From Swiss-Prot:
Enzyme kind, highest EC tier: oxidoreductase
Amino-acid positions noted as binding [4Fe-4S] cluster 2 in the UniProt annotation, renumbered to this chain: C21, C48, C51, C54
Residue ranges of every copy of the 4Fe-4S ferredoxin-type domain listed in the record: 1-31, 39-68
Taxonomic source organism: Welwitschia mirabilis (Tree tumbo)
Pfam families: Fer4_7
Molecular-function annotations in GO: 4 iron, 4 sulfur cluster binding; electron transfer activity; metal ion binding; oxidoreductase activity
Gene Ontology annotations for the cellular component aspect, listed alphabetically: chloroplast thylakoid membrane; photosystem I
Residue ranges of the TM segments: none
Residues given in the record as [4Fe-4S] cluster 1 binding sites: C11, C14, C17, C58
Upper taxonomic lineage: Eukaryota, Viridiplantae, Streptophyta, Embryophyta, Tracheophyta
Name of the protein in its database record: Photosystem I iron-sulfur center
GO BP annotations listed: photosynthetic electron transport in photosystem I
EC number: 1.97.1.12
Keyword list, A-Z: 4Fe-4S, Chloroplast, Electron transport, Iron, Iron-sulfur, Membrane, Metal-binding, Oxidoreductase, Photosynthesis, Photosystem I, Plastid, Repeat, Thylakoid, Transport
Amino acid sequence: MAHSVKIYDTCIGCTQCVRACPTDVLEMVPWNGCRAKQIASAPRTEDCVGCKRCESACPTDYLSVRVYLRQETTRSMGLAY
């Protein structure tokens, strides 16, 4: 089941979320916006099972990676109107 995965620019490039993902949804890509020169990316969201282990592994206070489960996304879209 595909879920929406959003990586925010508060990512520090630590790779914790990538290592925590049991289905290999995340990978690191080059980015000059942080000291590590890399940021998490979610190229395979169709494999996301919604376990949110990536969120739990994120050491930033900003929760740089967020998984929006299908029902959460639908609910959020309804509030936008």
